[in-house]
A protein has these predicted regions:
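Extended, subdomain-level signal for the structured scaffold at the beginning of enzyme domains
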Residues: 1-141, 150-153
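A conserved active-site-flanking secondary-structure segment within enzyme catalytic domains
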Residues: 158-165
Length: 165
């Protein structure tokens, strides 16, 4: 896979754009599993899917260049096998079920819509087990905003200082 990019030269008063080419191996494409449950904020879920799916492609589309292969392949993973609605009644159709034990190098826990006195204690035990298994298998686990509450529920933050907003 060949990617064309432009950069500005530092040695001139007025930056000149110079094209260069770099090769990106197709095996660099990474799958990212974004977790969805009914408490997930719909904007966070689909915002992440959109941003991750555009990685490595948006610039080519803007300048009319040939599209390149995707760099990140985001998929929605859920403990629920059927479609459901998440925060603000946004419909979700999971791509993958937790029961299928999917593996990926990246697992993301997006924002949750929880009341200030609400927690996830005892909810989704299979999901919590799966997140721990992914971590133990080498996956990078990321959380956004209140998704850190789900990360804390897994026990992976035990003994660590952590915060959410």
């Amino acid at each position: 896979l060949i990617v064309r990019a432009t950069c500005a030269k530092k040695d001139s008063f007025v930056p000149k754009k110079e094209a260069f080419w770099m090769e990106i191996p197709s095996e660099a494409v990474k799958e990212a599993l974004v977790v969805a449950v009914p408490e997930t904020a719909g904007s966070a879920l689909y915002g992440m899917i959109d941003v991750l799916a555009s990685a490595g492609k948006l610039w080519q589309e803007l300048v009319g260049a040939s599209p390149i292969l995707e760099q990140i392949s985001p998929k929605i993973v859920s403990p629920l096998s059927d479609s459901f609605v998440c925060g603000n009644n946004i419909p979700v159709i999971p791509d993958i079920k937790i029961a299928d034990q999917p593996q990926a190098p990246i697992v993301i826990l997006p924002e949750l819509w929880l009341a200030p006195d609400e927690d996830l204690n005892g909810r989704y035990p299979d999901l919590m087990d799966w997140i721990r298994q992914c971590y133990q298998s080498g996956s990078s686990i990321y959380s956004a905003c209140s998704g850190s509450i789900m990360l804390a529920e897994t026990g992976l933050l035990d003994g660590c200082k952590a915060t959410s907003h």
